[in-house]
Amino acid sequence: MVTRLIRATMDGVQNSVRISGELSSSFESRRGLRQGDGLSCLLFNIALEGVMRRAGLNSRGTIFTKSSQFVCFADDMDIIARTFGTVAEQYTRLKREAAKVGLVVNAAKTKYMLVGGTERDRTSLGSNVTIDGDTFEVVEEFVYLGSLLTADNNVSREIRKRIISGSRAYYGLQKKLRSKKIHPRTKCTMYKTLIRPVVLYGHEMWTMLEEDMQALGVFERRVLRTIFGGVQENGVWRRRMNHELAALYGEPSIQKVAKAGRIRWAGHVARMPDNNPAKLVFANHPVGTRRRGAQRARWADQVERDLASVGRDRRWRAAAANRVLWRQIVDSVLS
């Protein structure tokens, strides 16, 4: 009954396009879903779930315990596998099952990235790979769901990318931030709601170096200097010093906000069920070796350092189970 009702709403759909205030003649849609229809997202997800099941693609678990993993958010898909052959097999099955329901993989927007591996592996791979007749560019970095993923897991490049995006938002609002008609507190609210979130998108998972923290601070002070302007002493204008900006702003710095967000997310992960993908990745210990010399900090190491700065690094996973206590810990980071 429900299927027939849905089909009835989709059959014989007439559309028109508004051009320069005038409507075009109507035309009938015989394929695809209607843009803006409340059912479109649901129907697409059902169709894609059916494709995944028939193709034998399993999104559960993690790559630590399987030869391949399929990650999907709407129509943004990621095939993760241990070998090129497994990637090719999974892609071929996905492509052929998707074609049966009228879905086509956009090969032009699909990229292939080798994570880890040696320089010899990268050289032998070349600049393109071909799978089932489709040619994909081999890349060193790729933007997935707004975040920059790199072959060497370089988070600093993602942070630089976020700062560049934040700079675009800043320049777009620069005229208002310089305006004498807008109160500085209102400008600060504009910064916190329209600019800072652009910079801190995905910050909960950042493992940051000291130079990354400094880059964030430099960006924030640039915005604050625009908001509060210079100061005149003895008829001479000078740029405000860092401590003067902090006193005028009166809010937690962007570095503290990033640290608090990371701790807040760590608490969420610690409280997740054991079969949750994020919890599985966090609790797992991948098989392999680490390079000689000084080791890169892991995300868990960063969280423990953040908690150590407020004296909460011991038994923090147990503390995370208490939401009220954990909220107090997060607030203490912002103070």
Where does each model-flagged region fall?
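Short linear motifs embedded in intrinsically disordered, charge-biased segments
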Residues: 3, 15-335
